[in-house]
């Protein structure tokens, strides 16, 4: 069993950092601000799914297969990511892209993550169907990676690699492990 299969993540209530924690933990202490965060309840049965409301951060439960969920607390209509309605999840080797909700830097993150922290401005962007992009295959037979093709042509741009380093977490054997994601920002000419 891989370490990634035994970990979950949440956003710290004190400093908004993305925290990784071992599955089954009831509380997680943030290494940066020392806030103790309660872990949300375990995932619902297969016929039900859950999503965090983008408006008020309340956990919402809904019937699997729904395309949107309306929050009864703040009345926000939340789009359900396509992968939330599937029983089988995308392989952990897939990555997806999203623009930072604050500085618009393009960030890459593991497919299925609920949020991404930007290394440039430290903003935590929640991932949902309306702002995430299709997962990119990380490996092709010749060992190279390529984004999916598009029908529109874009002018040449310069790219800059951005490293997103989340707070360290503890693996199943009690050792501290780093959580790093690579992002790409473009400076269009």
Curated annotation (Swiss-Prot):
One of its GO terms (cellular component) is nucleus. Residues 147-159 have a biased composition (Low complexity). Its main location: cytoplasm. The keyword RNA-binding does not apply. Residues 136-159 are annotated as: Disordered. Keywords: Apoptosis, Cytoplasm, Hypersensitive response, Nucleus, Plant defense. Induction: By methyl viologen. Disruption phenotype: No visible phenotype under normal growth condition, however cold treatment induces the development of yellowish leaves with necrosis, and treatment with salicylic acid or infection with avirulent pathogen causes a runaway cell death and plant death. Residues 9-39, 50-80, 97-127 are annotated as: LSD1-type zinc-finger. InterPro entries: LSD1-like, Znf_LSD1. When expressed in Arabidopsis, Pisum sativa LSD1 interacts with importin alpha via the LSD1-type zinc finger motifs, suggesting that the nuclear import of LSD1 may rely on the interaction between its zinc finger motifs and importin alpha. NCBIfam families: LSD1. Interacts with BZIP10 and AMC1 (via N-terminus). Binds to BZIP63. Interacts with CAT1, CAT2 and CAT3 in a zinc-finger-dependent manner. Interacts (via N-terminus) with GILP. This is Protein LSD1.
């Amino acid at each position: 069993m891989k370490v990634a299969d035994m970990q979950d993540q949440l956003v710290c209530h004190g400093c908004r950092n993305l925290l990784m924690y071992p599955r089954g933990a009831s509380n997680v202490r943030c290494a940066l601000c020392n806030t103790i965060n309660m872990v949300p309840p375990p995932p619902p049965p297969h016929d039900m799914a859950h999503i965090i409301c983008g408006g008020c951060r309340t956990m919402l439960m809904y019937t699997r297969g729904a395309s949107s969920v309306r929050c009864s607390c703040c009345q926000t209509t939340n789009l359900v990511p396509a992968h939330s309605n599937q029983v089988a999840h995308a392989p952990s080797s897939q990555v997806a892209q999203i623009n930072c909700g604050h500085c618009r830097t393009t960030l890459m993150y593991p497919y299925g993550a609920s949020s991404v922290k930007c290394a440039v401005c430290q903003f935590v962007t929640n991932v949902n169907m309306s702002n995430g992009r299709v997962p990119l295959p990380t490996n092709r037979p010749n060992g190279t990676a390529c984004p999916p093709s598009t029908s529109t042509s874009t002018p040449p741009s310069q790219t800059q690699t951005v490293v997103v380093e989340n707070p360290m977490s503890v693996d199943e054997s009690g050792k501290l492990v780093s959580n790093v994601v690579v992002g790409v920002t473009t400076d269009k000419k």
